[in-house]
Amino acid sequence: MNQIQPRPKRRLFGTDGIRGRANTAPMTAEIALRLGQAAGLLFTRGDHRHRVIIGKDTRLSGYMLEPALTAGFIGAGMDVTLAGPLPTPAIAMLTRSLRADLGVVISASHNPFEDNGIKLFGPDGAKLSDETEAEIEALMEEDLSGRLAAPSALGRAMRLVDAAGRYVESAKSSLPRGLRLDGLRVVLDCANGAAYKVAPAALWELGAEVITLGVSPDGFNINHECGSTVPSALSAAVVKHRADLGIALDGDADRVILADERGRIIDGDQVLALIARAFQADGRLSGSGIVATVMSNLGLERYLGGLGLALHRTPVGDRYVAEHMRAHGLNLGGEQSGHVILADFATTGDGLIAALQVLAVLVREGRPASEVCRLFTPLPQLLRNVRYSGASPLLSPAVTAAAAAAEARLAGIGRLLLRASGTEPLIRVMAEGEDEQLVAAVVDELCAVIEAESAG
């Protein structure tokens, strides 16, 4: 049985930066200012001119958080480069390209507009480690008044006017030179989010016919009945327009979900399988495996095994996938939810670049997506959340015994995962296996035991 314990808890930072309801702690202007000061002080190392890149998605609250962060960084002595609405992977790329000390993205990813978040990237374009985030939190608790920049050492702010074009060119360069998408009709749903300009531009410049959805952000409609978490509109549009492929991004475009020409959804596991096969055939896959999380389907693991590839599993969160990839020299990883990290081209999940790799396979093989993108049959998988109060019941004797019994029933035909949520008082119970009825029974029984332990 896999039992995944949460990383050491921090007060503000979760698995993907700081996130919450806009204008409510921790997503207030005051906390954003404090964060800018603390992170700025931590990353003003050496005697060069220090710089931070700030990007955002299309939420209304971005207009509140962006100037607050800017003021904090300037007060710490850092120059601020404002990139405007751009995908998360674009900010990671620009952080490296501009030799910045830090990158900041203001986004709550796939969440509704009422939420917002802040995530930080180091000079290498990678998300900050848990330890570095803990250092920032500790600084935020201190009196920083005597450590901020002198009047003559304050930073400056400027806008990077060609930020979008730089990212479009970077994404296009992930395809082999000379490969074009002429003749392909693509439906693209940008979730009224950060990629609403750059993703259509990249596909159009590569020669595809692009039918767009979710490209009219108004500050309120990000992820609203659109994007990768609500792919039904994408599926319908693909069928209506007889498109070759549908591409749905989320609000900050770091994840992607696809639809084949029949409108059937293709999740992140299937995308990983396809890219792994293509990269292995081309000799571009580094190492002898790829990285995914504990949530990826056992069907993916078995398919990769047939190719002679291992599936390395990490806790949930694309940052942990990326860390494992770097530690083991692997260049492909991702999550079932659609985060796909191609380390040869990006340091974090990039929905557009992942979609381009799939389109490249369609061009080369000349077969429909329904044939190319369905390389394995997922095993039945069931996930249920159990809310508890008080102490976590995860390690109670009754739950441990019930989990061991469930694992024995799934031996050889499936697997079981129990993990505590890192952000809510929830126990996540996931089982998958060849027998759908058995999977459902195992989850029902375990949830009942957890609920009884919590109530007791």
Curated annotation (Swiss-Prot):
Gene3D superfamilies documented for this protein? Alpha-D-Glucose-1,6-Bisphosphate, subunit A, domain 3, Alpha-D-phosphohexomutase, C-terminal domain
- Enzyme type, top EC level: isomerase
Query: How does the record describe the protein's post-translational processing?
Result: Activated by phosphorylation.
Q: What is its EC number?
A: 5.4.2.10
* Positions that bind Mg(2+): S109, D250, D252, D254
Cofactor binding summary note: Binds 1 Mg(2+) ion per subunit.
This enzyme catalyses:
alpha-D-glucosamine 1-phosphate = D-glucosamine 6-phosphate
Annotated protein name in UniProt: Phosphoglucosamine mutase
**What is the species listed in this Swiss-Prot or TrEMBL entry?**
Acidiphilium cryptum (strain JF-5)
